[in-house]
Amino acid sequence: MPRADLDKRPGDVAAMFDAIAGRYDLLNDLLSAGQVRLWRRAVARITGAAPGDRVLDLAAGTATSALSFTATGADCVACDFSLGMLQAGQSRLAARKQRNPGRLGLVAGDALRLPFRDEAFDAVTISFGLRNVADPEQGLAEMRRVTRPGGRLVVCEFSTITITPVDMVYRRYLLGVLPEIARRTARSPEAYQYLAESISDWPAQRELAGLIEAAGWSAVRWRDLSLGAVAVHVARRPRG
C-alpha cells in the first residue's frame, strides 16, 4: 500500500489500521513514552460514566480504552471500522482473567453511518479517531444523533501545544523522529507517517470547539493535557 495521504478514504484508513492491529497498543506506548495510558485515564475521569450508563466508545481500536468505562460498572459498546483492530481486541479480551462489572460489546461500524438507534447512549467518546473520519462534522452530528438529550460527548485528540518553543520541538519530533522510529520498529511505518501528517494538519483547540458546536452540541469546553499536545473536548447534547 502506498504511504497514506490525508484524503482519509475509509477503505484505505481501515486497511492501514488492520495492518498494525497486532502491535498497535505496544507501539502507542512506545511512541508516546507511556503518556497514552495517562490520557486514557483522563478521558475516563472526564466522561464520568456511572454504573448502568451506556457508553459508545468510537474508534475504539482493540477496545483497550473501553475497559476504562466497564471498570466503573458502565456498559460500553466499542465501535471501530477496522475489523483487524476489533479482532485483535477480541482475542485479548478472551485471554483476560479479570472481568469488569460493566458489559462490553464490540461492533464494526462507520462513524459517518453509526449502526445504532437514535438517543441510544448516555455518553459518546472518541479518542484519537476524529482525525481519521472523512467528514468530521458529519461524524459529530451522527454522534449527537445517538446520544440522549442531556448526554455528553468527549473527544480526545492530538492538538496544539500552547508554548511556542515547546511546540517547535514537538513538531520536529512528530514529523521527523516519530516516522523514523516507526520505520525501524513497525511493520507498516506508513501508518505512522500518516499519523504525523494528520496531527500536523489537525485544527487547534478553539477551531475544533467551533466544529463541535456547528454539529449541534452545546456547552463545549476543553482541557489541555501534556501542555496541549492532547486536548479533551467535552460537550452536551441540548435538551428539547
Question: What are the roles of these predicted feature ranges?
Answer:
Residues 218-240:
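Core SAM-dependent methyltransferase catalytic element
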Residues 23, 33-51:
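Conserved alpha-helix/loop element of class I SAM-dependent methyltransferases that forms part
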